[in-house]
A protein has these predicted regions:
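Active-site segment of metal-dependent pyrophosphate-handling enzymes
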Residues: 40-42
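Vicinal oxygen chelate
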Residues: 5-13, 34, 44-47, 53-54, 67-89, 91-133, ...
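A short, sequence-level motif marking secondary-structure junctions
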Residues: 58-61, 133
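Short, Lys/Arg-enriched, disordered terminal segments
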Residues: 1-3, 133
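A short secondary-structure junction signal
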Residues: 20-21, 57, 129
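Short, charged/polar surface micro-motifs in flexible loops or helix N-caps
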Residues: 49-53, 60-62, 87
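A cross-kingdom feature marking solvent-exposed beta-strand/loop segments within repeated
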Residues: 4-6, 18, 23, 28-38, ...
Length: 133
């Protein structure tokens, strides 16, 4: 089912400062901020040779990231995203094995591809995002 690691998402309190650190101090290729209103976040992608880092910050108080900051005042790792070849097949396998999918249907993610999130309770406390290749 799992293919490659697509990205690791880090919730940050100051998106501009975090992006500057990755670009100016760590020398990484940093993308432009991208609002994702359907997910309630603004994201910046850091391009690395073998994967990406996604810096995320809430768009408002209704954002799931806003709730994350209630528990993690300074931010931190929010989720890990893996690619799958067939998201619908992956969802069926997961549901048949009683894993919880957050939300009813896939949404279009920041890369323009369908994504789902898997509840952390089935993955040792880690929020997992699956993105169709």
């Amino acid at each position: 089912m799992l293919e490659r690691l697509n990205h690791v998402a880090i919730a940050v309190t100051d998106l501009k400062s975090a992006a500057n650190t990755y670009r100016d101090i760590l020398g990484a290729k940093v993308g432009e901020p991208l609002d994702q209103p359907e997910h309630g976040v603004t994201v910046v992608f850091i391009e690395l040779p073998n994967t990406k880092v996604e810096l995320i910050t809430p768009l408002g108080e209704n954002s799931p990231i806003f709730n994350f900051f209630n528990k993690n005042k300074n931010g931190g790792i929010h989720h890990i995203c893996y690619e799958v070849k067939n998201l619908e097949l992956s969802m069926n396998i997961l549901m048949k094995n009683n894993y919880k999918i957050i939300g009813d249907n896939p949404k279009i993610g920041a890369h323009g591809k369908p994504v789902i999130f898997l509840h952390p309770s089935g993955f040792d406390g880690t929020l997992i995002e699956l993105q169709e290749e």
